[in-house]
Each structure stands twice: as C-alpha cells, then as structure tokens.
C-alpha cells in the first residue's frame, strides 16, 4: 500500500518541476508567483463576480456604487482579473443572457470572444448556473414545488450546456443556490433530492454528448437557512454516483469550495479524499478562506489557517488534481484587483509549501506510521512556520 501511494503521489510533478521548486528561496512576490504557477502547471482562475462590485443587506447599492468609473459589466471584470495577473475567468450562464434567465445572447458571446477575451488573451474555464437571483426562483430552482418552475430551472442549466458548446468551456458547475429549506417540515427532502438528481441526469446526458464535465457544488446553508439541498461533500458524491449510474460513465463530479467545507466543519482536504475514495472526480476547486463553522465569508485565500490551506493543496497534489483553482471571494470593501492579486500571491506561496511537503512524502509516511502529532509536526512545521 505504501508503494502504491508513493507512486500515485509522485505523478503530479516532474523531477524538473520539483527541482525548480526546491531551488526557490524566500517569499514569492507577484512576478515570482506567476512564474511558479506557470512552471509547476498549477492552474489559477477567478470567478467573474469576484472582480465586480459586491452588495449585501447592509449596502444594497454596492460597496463601489459611489465610484462612477467602476464598471460592473463582464468586460470590466475581465480587465480587473487580467490586471491582477490572472488570465482565466469563470462565468455564469446569466452573463450571456439578454435578460436575467431570458434568451441566450449569441451576439454577446461573439463580441466577448472576438473582443475583450481575445484582446487580453483570456480563457473561460467554467460556466456556473444562476437559478437564485431571479425572484421567480425564490422557492427553488430544480427543486421548486412548482413543476413549471422546475422545468424553467432545468432550461437554465441546459443554457449553460449550450454556452459551454459555443465557447468551448470544459466544465459546467451547478450550485443549487435557492434549493433547500428555511424551516423544519418545509420540504420533503427525499422528493427534492430526487428532483435535483433527475434534472442532473438530463443535463449530464447532454454534457456527455459534447465532452463537457458536470460538477455539483455542495454548501451547508446560505441563502437557505436550515440547509441547502446538497449540504455536504458526501451528499454531492452520492448524487454524482446516482447521476453517473443513470447516465453511464463517470462524468458527473464535484466542485469543492474551500470555505463551504469550513462551514461544514470539515476540510477541503477531507472532501477531496472522500471523493477519491468514492471514485468521483473533482472537476474544480473554489479557493477563498473562512472561519470554522461560520457563514460563507469568502475571504482572500490563506488569511485564516495556513496549515489547513497547505494541507488542502498538498492533498490535491497527492490526488493528481490538474484542473483550475478558482477564486470565489467576496472582498466587499476592497479593490477587487488588489484582492485578486493578493489571493493569487498567497495561493502561490502556500502551494510552494505544499509542494515541499509533497516532495518529502517518505518522511511524512514514516511520521504517520508513528501516529503522533509531534512526529508529523517534526516533518511539516519546518515548512509551515520555518
């Protein structure tokens, strides 16, 4: 078993990459961070919303609404992301709808592809689905008690498939943001999760036709206050298994959000390993930070718990994850460009620590066999706090 684990773990980086990382000294600034991520082939992206304005119930107009020069359109979000040093961005299907949950806007897609994306040399890595902003979905999207609205929500997800086809986006990610319950007895959970699974089976069959990966993103609660329909990584894995069983293949997988796992009072590292144990792929990781058991804070990455962040990245390397780590952060009062840049630099520096622990796997394996905290800390602490 030890030899099998070592073989798996050593597949993520080449000897040349590990040698390069071993030669790096001190703190990585912005140029060094960008070079490190490129050399190590660690992919980094940003959700378009993280480069926009931010609203909450305390500042409904938006924290940057007093700045007439602050654009909130997709082009402005792309330009801020690129200015932060990141050349990959995620979208929602609603970015390319004529109105919220209205008709697709192929002309807008073409303008973006030929215009700002081409100009900046940017790629779109994931299409997410919004079935919560429109008030018609206030009681749910794919799990709405009204069958007509369940159908409308399914159509929104299928629009995402169409956008992926048109823009050659490899991943479609579904976070059911309005589905769940606020009160006990409000829904029949088994019925609701069956509706959700049935919708995803339909979507996954379309994804399979076009080589698009389908991901489910779990979250314990918020905006639904009792629970979301997919509240845990384990529940997402169960649904993905059912979707794959009904569709054939293993195309349906997970999006794991770092902060959502903190809300769940587990870790993104254990969620990654649980998916690997179950044979379910992780198609995307959302990075941010949050305090354990609190709300979805979406802070800049690496600002709360460095050991936990490093273990998470280490685990993704051990499990040979090669997709994108995408910023999903709501830095309400900050300049989004500076916040994106700061997260990227933090991410690169913590990824370097994770690579160094990864490269010292035999020592970590030996310490784990001893089973004590000090033995393990003897291996990792020089990297974490040295």
Where are these regions (language model features)?
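Active-site-proximal loop/turn and secondary-structure-junction residues that shape catalytic pockets
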Residues: 50-52, 93-95, 128-133, 176-180, ...
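Flexible, acidic glycine-rich loops studded with aromatic residues
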Residues: 96, 309-364
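N-terminal pre-domain/capping segments
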Residues: 2-170, 248-252, 344-386
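A short, acidic, amphipathic alpha-helical segment used as a generic capping/interface helix at domain edges
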Residues: 28-30, 270, 304-318
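Short, electropositive alpha-helical surface patch
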Residues: 102-120, 146-150, 181-194, 225-241, ...
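Active-site groove signature of glycoside hydrolases
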Residues: 164-185, 213-221
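Acidic/histidine-rich catalytic cores of soluble enzymes
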Residues: 39, 46, 52, 58, ...
């Amino acid at each position: 078993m030890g030899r099998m684990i070592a073989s798996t773990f050593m597949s993520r980086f080449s000897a040349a990459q590990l040698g390069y990382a071993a030669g790096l000294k001190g703190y990585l600034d912005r140029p060094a961070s960008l070079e490190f991520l490129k050399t190590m082939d660690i992919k980094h992206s940003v959700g378009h919303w993280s480069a926009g304005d931010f609203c909450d119930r305390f500042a409904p107009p938006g924290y940057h609404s007093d700045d007439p020069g602050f654009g909130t359109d997709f082009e402005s979000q792309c330009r801020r992301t690129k200015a932060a040093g990141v050349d990959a961005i995620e979208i929602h299907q609603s970015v390319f709808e004529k109105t919220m949950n209205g008709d697709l806007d192929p002309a807008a897609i073409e303008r973006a592809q030929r215009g700002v994306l081409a100009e900046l040399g940017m790629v779109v890595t994931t299409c997410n689905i919004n079935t919560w902003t429109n008030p018609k979905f206030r009681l749910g999207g794919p799990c709405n008690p009204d069958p007509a609205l369940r159908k409308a929500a399914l159509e929104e997800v299928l629009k995402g498939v169409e956008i992926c086809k048109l823009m050659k986006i490899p991943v479609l990610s579904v976070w059911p943001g309005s589905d769940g319950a606020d009160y006990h007895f409000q829904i029949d959970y088994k019925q609701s999760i069956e509706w959700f699974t049935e919708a995803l089976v339909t979507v996954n069959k379309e994804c399979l036709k076009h080589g698009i990966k389908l991901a489910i993103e779990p979250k314990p609660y918020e905006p639904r206050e009792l629970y979301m329909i997919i509240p845990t990584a384990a529940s997402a894995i169960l649904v993905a298994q059912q979707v794959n069983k009904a569709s054939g293949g293993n195309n349906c997988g997970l999006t794991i959000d770092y902060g959502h796992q903190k809300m769940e009072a587990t870790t993104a590292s254990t969620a990654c390993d649980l998916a690997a144990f179950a044979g379910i792929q992780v198609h995307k990781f959302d990075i941010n930070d949050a305090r354990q058991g609190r709300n979805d804070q979406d802070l800049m990455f690496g600002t709360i718990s460095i050991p936990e962040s490093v273990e998470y990245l280490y685990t993704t390397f051990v499990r040979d994850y090669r997709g994108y780590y995408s910023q999903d952060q709501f830095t309400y009062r900050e300049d989004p460009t500076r916040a994106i840049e700061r997260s990227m630099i933090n991410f690169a520096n913590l990824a370097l620590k994770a690579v160094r622990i990864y490269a010292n796997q035999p020592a970590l394996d030996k310490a784990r066999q001893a089973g004590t905290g000090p033995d393990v800390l003897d291996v990792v602490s020089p990297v974490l706090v040295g």
